[in-house]
């Protein structure tokens, strides 16, 4: 696990989204980087901006095509802010998600998706040919939400496999999980763990947060309806 904690901020604007009863922010389609089973509703869209360590920035736009299917694109630079020669990522990246099973009182919602957007530098032209933090690729995610005295509590988990960032020889399936909880109508806390099994020599048998992966946390502030600011701490 990287010892350096990176401070990131994410601004998300969601238009046309219908919120569940009693919930003052939309169920997150992602926690910080981890995908959940939630999708944008038909006709709604979200615009996100991620500021990365080293002056990088990623802009993303997602739209709800149906109540179950969302489509998005993202693009950016690992050093947009700063004095170094500007470098862009090699291509726009895709983000697709389809909700297979609706969440019920007794069972979680389940979604499948594709996310090809990684983070950090893109190591092009060397033996890696990948982002510093690999994209999730194809994934299956599950989410379950409960109403608490504070607000909504959501638990999320999933498995993923990437098909392009494999030049480093690590093609292991990956595991991820996380949670989000409302503290009040304005503030929410998000936590996640991406085991990054396709980036290290850890396996499911030796899985441990202390051995590797990315442990992230964020504080989400709903400034006004449909406008959310996140202060994120990433390993």
Give the role of each language-model region.
Residues 179:
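Mobile, glycine-rich extracellular loop/lid and propeptide segments
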Residues 17-153, 160-164, 182-235:
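Transmembrane beta-barrel domains of Gram-negative outer membranes and organellar outer membranes
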Residues 1, 154, 165-167:
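C-terminal intrinsically disordered extensions
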Residues 170-171:
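Glycine- and Gly-Pro-enriched alpha-helical subdomains that act as flexible
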Residues 3-14:
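Sec-dependent N-terminal signal peptides
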């Amino acid at each position: 696990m990287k010892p350096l904690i990176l401070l990131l901020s994410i601004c998300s604007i969601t238009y046309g989204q219908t919120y569940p009863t009693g919930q003052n922010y939309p169920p997150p389609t992602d926690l910080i980087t981890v995908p959940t089973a939630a999708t944008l509703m038909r006709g709604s869209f979200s615009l996100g901006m991620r500021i990365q360590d080293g002056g990088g920035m990623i802009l993303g736009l997602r739209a709800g095509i149906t109540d179950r299917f969302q489509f998005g694109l993202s693009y950016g630079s690992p050093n947009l802010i700063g004095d170094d020669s500007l470098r862009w990522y090699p291509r726009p990246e895709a983000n697709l998600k389809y909700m297979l099973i609706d969440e019920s009182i007794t069972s979680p919602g389940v979604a499948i998706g594709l996310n090809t957007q990684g983070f950090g530098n893109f190591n092009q032209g060397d033996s890696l040919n990948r982002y510093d933090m690999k994209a999730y690729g194809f994934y299956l995610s599950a989410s379950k939400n409960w109403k608490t005295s504070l607000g909504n509590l959501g638990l999320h988990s999933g498995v993923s496999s990437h098909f392009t960032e494999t030049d480093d020889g690590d093609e292991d399936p990956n595991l991820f999980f996380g949670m989000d909880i409302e503290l009040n109508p304005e503030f929410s806390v998000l936590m996640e763990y991406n085991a990054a099994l396709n980036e290290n020599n850890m396996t499911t048998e030796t899985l441990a947060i202390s051995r590797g992966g990315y442990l992230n946390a964020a504080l989400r502030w709903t400034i006004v309806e449909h406008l959310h600011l996140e202060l994120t701490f990433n390993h």
